[in-house]
């Protein structure tokens, strides 16, 4: 019995129907500003009145807590191995943004098995009463844990920079997602943000370039959510362990994060008006199909 089937049985037995919006933020390579994207979008969502919890899914190398300047008492080890509830391991950061630590420097968290991943994904449903949006901040690359969260999420936000390696690795990540036997293109919607661009045109060109290849070879539709300019204020905020959206709301990057958050909320409103089901977790998706990926 695979993980997807286990989760569907859990839902049938417990009648769990999550309604919190789940957005998984990911990247093909490290160092592209993915975690900064996660925390600043969370802050912008809070400014819009949304309740937000971040799951730091970069297991063993978690850095959301560092960027928030917080010291969590608990992490996912306490959920997976100690039997604590997921609500017990939430740390509340600035502006009442909650986050769940993936465990920084904990070797056992860097190579979680499928049972542990199932436990984490299952427990996300229990956050429904506490939050409107769950942001899953994955590690970079195409590890099993990253792909499990991508196929389990209704929305994937891909962070890419103009660097050739970032573009190539982003395509490799999407190809791995496309080949995953449980990937459902009708369930998981892929969005992209161009980060650290010199201007708006560069961001649009970057998206058009990647989207053309993805559309041709993978047939995965992508939605462009906008770009974030290269801004020294971001690094200054990181050094002071305060999100730039709080430290300097007028910074170019902060304004860009705000526009992206607004677009993402508009996208959710459009879905609601069309009376489509909210995209949450894997066990609300259609049954998986066995498919052969040739490319």
What role is predicted for each listed range?
Residues 1-28:
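Extreme N-terminal, non-catalytic leader segments
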Residues 24-83:
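Walker A/P-loop NTP-binding active-site region of P-loop NTPases
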Residues 57-129, 239:
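P-loop/Walker-type NTP enzyme "switch/lid" segment
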Residues 104, 127-146:
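Switch II (G3) loop of P-loop NTPases
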Residues 138-226:
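Conserved catalytic-core segment of NTP-binding enzymes
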Residues 215-243, 257:
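Beta-strand-loop-alpha "switch" segments that mediate conformational coupling across diverse proteins
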Residues 250-270:
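Extended, charge-rich low-complexity interaction segments
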Residues 283-292:
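Conserved small/polar residues in nucleotide/adenosyl-binding loops
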